[in-house]
Amino acid sequence: ERYRPSHVLILSGDHIYKMDYSLFASYHQEKEADVTISLLEVGTELAHQFGVAEVDEEFRILGFQEKPKEAPKTVPGDPSHVLASMGIYLFRTETLMEVLTSGDEADFGTDIIPHLLNSHRIYAYPYRQQNKIEDYIYVTLPDGERQLRLEPHTRDSAYWRDVGDLDAYWNANMDLTGVEPYFNLYGQRWPLHTYQTAAPPAKFVFATERSDGFRVGKALDSLVAPGCIVSGIVRNSVLSPNAIVRSWAQVDESVIMDSVVVGRHCKIKKAIIDKHNIIPPKTTIGYNPSEDRKRFTVTPRGIVVIPKRFFKEEE
């Protein structure tokens, strides 16, 4: 009320995506909508995880089911997919204020959207069709060379992840590690800014490779933050600031949080290790599910989760 905006954009805080909100707003205005909801196609087997919209040929929303357990409304002409809510809403301010002052309704999918369907113009925004991220990215040519090219519709234009559980969080981190990642942090036109830790550059030590191959500090297909010191091998992983991977240690497909020390000869695979863990030498994590479950949380996908300060002292 203080700023008197004509529209209000409502977002969720646990989703990862790149979205040109100006395209979203233009679509909303073209439809003369009171509310526009960004939706994406997902398989019907996932419908129970989302709010699901029923639409007509013009993408006007006719019905809305909140996490249907059976018989979800499918995409017209495609019975194997549904249109799932991304938790991104654009409201005319008048419409939003009308809802907020009319009663105790609080949940968008259960209360607010169904309440508005019969009296307001509510439209679906087909995210993967309409969202376009234009950016310079490196592409691999047929001869193997890498070239910087302006792409009018990058691959991550269609990317969206809800990281509300540990498996999804791990998946989202792994999406960053590829040579051509599913979600690109390095675009020139769409850079992602974050808090920078006051730490020195990452350091990779022991340059003379030994017969066992593991004394050399190196990270492959990985993201390594400032302050890290690596003298083991890191593959397909994300290292947060000030992490240390000691000699002969191996870290694969893992997310290592701030100030974690991975001791010598450790073997870690498919793990999320929270802050300030000092992992003793020769510790093995992620290779024996039954043993891991005795000590740690193991997700449905088999990701081992080590809580903060579980390992407190280096032996």
Segment roles from a protein language model:
Residues 2-5:
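Glycine-rich phosphate-binding loop signature in dinucleotide/nucleotide-binding domains
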Residues 11-12, 92:
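A secondary-structure boundary/capping signal
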Residues 23-27, 95, 112:
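Alpha-helical scaffold elements adjacent to nucleotide-binding pockets in ATP/GTP-utilizing enzyme cores
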Residues 14, 56, 162:
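Acidic active-site catalytic centers that drive phospho-/nucleotidyl reactions
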Residues 12-13, 21:
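Short acidic donor-binding/metal-coordinating loop in glycosyltransferase active sites
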Residues 8:
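Short aromatic/hydrophobic "clamp" motif used to bind/position activated sugar donors
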Residues 18-90, 102-104, 117-120:
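Conserved core of the sugar-phosphate nucleotidyltransferase
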